Curated annotation (Swiss-Prot):
Protein name (database record): Protein phosphatase 2C homolog 4
Note from the entry: Present with 149 molecules/cell in log phase SD medium.
Gene symbol of the encoding locus: PTC4
PROSITE patterns registered for this protein in UniProt: PPM_1 (PS01032), PPM_2 (PS51746)
Family designation: Belongs to the PP2C family.
Keyword Plastid (UniProt): no
Reactions catalysed, as given in the entry: O-phospho-L-seryl-[protein] + H2O = L-seryl-[protein] + phosphate; O-phospho-L-threonyl-[protein] + H2O = L-threonyl-[protein] + phosphate
Organism of this sequence: Saccharomyces cerevisiae (strain ATCC 204508 / S288c)
SMART domains: PP2Cc
Amino acid sequence: MGQLLSHPLTEKTIEYNEYKNNQASTGIVPRFYNCVGSMQGYRLTQEDAHLIRNENSVVYVRFFNPFIDKYETLSLNVFAVFDGHGGDDCSKFLSGGRHHRDGNGSSNGNGEPNAGLIKWIAYSFENHHYTSTTNNDSSKFKRSFNTLEGLVSQIFKDAFILQDEELYRHFANSSCGSTAVVACIINEESLYVANCGDSRCILSSKSNGIKTMSFDHKPQHIGELIRINDNGGTVSLGRVGGVLALSRAFSDFQFKRGVTYPHRRTKLTNITQNLTYGTPPQEAQVTVEPDVLMHKIDYSKDEFLVLACDGIWDIYNNKQLIHFIKYHLVSGTKLDTIITKLLDHGIAQANSNTGVGFDNMTAIIVVLNRKGETLQDWFNKMKTRLERERGLV
């Protein structure tokens, strides 16, 4: 668990994005209202970070769709949580924050800005070399896919690997690392969630429906354990090499010895032994390759998304967290107050016997409002729906 503070730091950073100015200036009702909250808690530092690209910061990409054989402009609304470990360098870098290290992991003091993971997501959409299986001349392409869903999922995997390659140039000798759970809504229709590590995303739907949009990556899970062992690693006490309680993460290059990245053929050497193996990044002991799940949004049923780090999921299971949020929605509580209560309740569960409740905590709630539906309209709809589901009216 590492060193802890004797008393928790319960000051919270709450960002409630109602986009009132946007609606007033454009007359267009915003989409995907959201609220993010974080709290340092008992940890010595805050190592969580997040990313929100919505409304004025929506990402637009020029994407070649081989299934219709033409270019399209796609809108990407992106929400992400990064849970750092070994410091906040990696998580802050992924979020597009400023970094302070040179290629050897030393402080350079200049705080150079960077675009973070979103840069590589956009790059991978605009520069992919994939086609459909119906293409009669597929030899010119890296790979062909049966479905657009499969192709887009591969694009997210490419983006994660490219980002990890960039991280190596800054943090090769650092012990920092980070999870990532990224929810990307494409053209306001299709939800893709790419996950690497044990942060998590879930989707709430009407009639108490809960859809898991990511799966935790733990070393003791059989598929992860096989990959770790095949690459010469071991798992003890639920940790890779007895150290890392994750089996997938950004950075953590001590567990990626000899990995060769495909973009610039950058080979990572074992820093202590200077051995090279040419291991694909997907086969490293701790791989950065995410799982990617897709969901077609049904605005008549789907209600909201929750993305959170494991500091939250140590306290709540999926059902408990959705129930907590809906309990407060039915009483008319706004999102910023719900997030505040969520964090306060979480820190109150700190238990030295179980070890839960001592981690940093970060959560994002994303409203899935239909086109033209204001935030107040959504609140009213949710309150009415929940009252009916609970037999209160």
